[in-house]
Amino acid sequence: MKKALLTCLLAASATAVSAQQRTKATLNHLALYVQDLEKATVFYRDLVGLDTIPEPFHDGKHTWFSVGPKSHLHLIAGATGPHTGDRNSHICFSVPSVESFIEKLAKAGIPFINWAGEKGKVTKRVDGVQQIYLQDPDGYWVEVNDAKE
């Protein structure tokens, strides 16, 4: 009897945890409105290193990327001008090595700054993570860091 009661309690607890997890919001996608879809696609695919994934529209106006488990980045063509905004509003990608990423930027002729705005410098956060900031072809700010988690 005790064993059956314990089994029921464990099952009820697991069901409650599962139901609780399903009610939390999760990130599905980020969308960026871009002027030149091909330039933006090359930036995120070839420079940042994201994998493209199928998009349902097949209209030449969208590129989708996987950016994590069940999370995507959607590029949407049609912007009539560059994005203007402060780097406090940015998207961030973690890479195995900021130094190796900086080498890719140098080969591509793409400048970067640290948090203080110093050109070609790297910020080292208080937790030891190194980070840089750059802008994509449309002016969106992108942070690249070497955070492990």
Which positions does each model-derived feature cover?
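Core segments of cupin and vicinal oxygen chelate
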Residues: 31-72
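Exposed loop/turn and edge beta-strand positions of beta-sandwich/beta-sheet ligand-binding modules
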Residues: 59, 87, 128-129
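Vicinal oxygen chelate
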Residues: 36-38, 91-138, 149
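N-terminal beta-strand motif that seeds the catalytic metal site of vicinal oxygen chelate
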Residues: 19-38, 89-91
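Bacterial Sec-dependent N-terminal signal peptides
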Residues: 1-22
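Mid-chain, structured segments of secreted extracytoplasmic proteins
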Residues: 62-108
